[in-house]
């Protein structure tokens, strides 16, 4: 953990946890072989399907200070044909320090209605269940 990620009390600033959750999610998708540009909008590109986060939560179990090592494990779970959530476990030196959760809803860009998850995300979720 770096100094810029702490608050005035010298412990983890709360918003950093959710940033790390999203970074771990993006990295997991990339390691699975899904290109970010196929899932996340970029300038000048219109996607047919969008995956907004509809819920997030964070629980802080122990303080994290500058210099603490940090490991993140994530567990995706399929909720229904149009939604999934990802649970995140944070540990430092083998002890649990935080947990997070993001819930994602697939919608069609054209009308903002629920839509089936993209095939790549479905494969990622299926592979996550099997491991």
Curated annotation (Swiss-Prot):
Pathway given for this chain reads: Cofactor biosynthesis; phylloquinone biosynthesis; Quinol/quinone metabolism; 1,4-dihydroxy-2-naphthoate biosynthesis; 1,4-dihydroxy-2-naphthoate from chorismate: step 7/7
Q: Which Gene3D superfamilies match?
A: Hotdog Thioesterase
Superkingdom of source? Bacteria
Q: Name one GO biological process term.
A: phylloquinone biosynthetic process
The answer to whether UniProt assigns keyword RNA-binding to this entry is: no
Which residues does UniProt mark as catalytic?
7
The UniProt catalytic activity note for this protein reads: 1,4-dihydroxy-2-naphthoyl-CoA + H2O = 1,4-dihydroxy-2-naphthoate + CoA + H(+)
Documented EC number(s): 3.1.2.28
Annotated InterPro entries: DHNA_CoA_hydrolase (IPR022829), HotDog_dom_sf (IPR029069)
Q: Does the keyword RNA-binding apply?
A: no
User: Which keywords describe this protein according to UniProt?
Assistant: Hydrolase
Q: What one GO molecular function would you report for this record?
A: 1,4-dihydroxy-2-naphthoyl-CoA thioesterase activity
Q: Pfam families, alphabetically?
A: 4HBT_2 (PF13279)
Going by the record, the broad EC class of this enzyme is: hydrolase
Which family does the entry's similarity section mention? Belongs to the 4-hydroxybenzoyl-CoA thioesterase family. DHNA-CoA hydrolase subfamily.
State the protein's purpose: Catalyzes the hydrolysis of 1,4-dihydroxy-2-naphthoyl-CoA (DHNA-CoA) to 1,4-dihydroxy-2-naphthoate (DHNA), a reaction involved in phylloquinone (vitamin K1) biosynthesis.
| Name this protein carries in UniProt | 1,4-dihydroxy-2-naphthoyl-CoA hydrolase
The organism named in the record is Synechococcus sp. (strain RCC307)
């Amino acid at each position: 953990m770096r100094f810029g990620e702490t608050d005035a009390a010298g412990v983890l600033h709360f918003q950093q946890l959710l940033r790390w959750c999203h970074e771990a999610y993006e990295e997991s998708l990339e390691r699975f072989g899904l290109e970010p540009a196929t899932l996340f909008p970029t300038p000048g590109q219109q996607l047919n399907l969008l995956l907004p986060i509809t819920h997030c939560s964070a629980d802080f179990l122990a303080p994290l200070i500058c210099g603490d090592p940090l490991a993140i494990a994530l567990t995706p779970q399929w909720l229904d044909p149009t939604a999934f959530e990802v649970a995140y476990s944070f540990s430092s030196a083998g002890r649990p320090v935080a947990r997070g959760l993001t819930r994602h809803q697939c919608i069609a860009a054209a009308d903002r209605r629920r839509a089936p998850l993209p095939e790549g995300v479905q494969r990622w979720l299926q592979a996550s269940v099997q491991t």
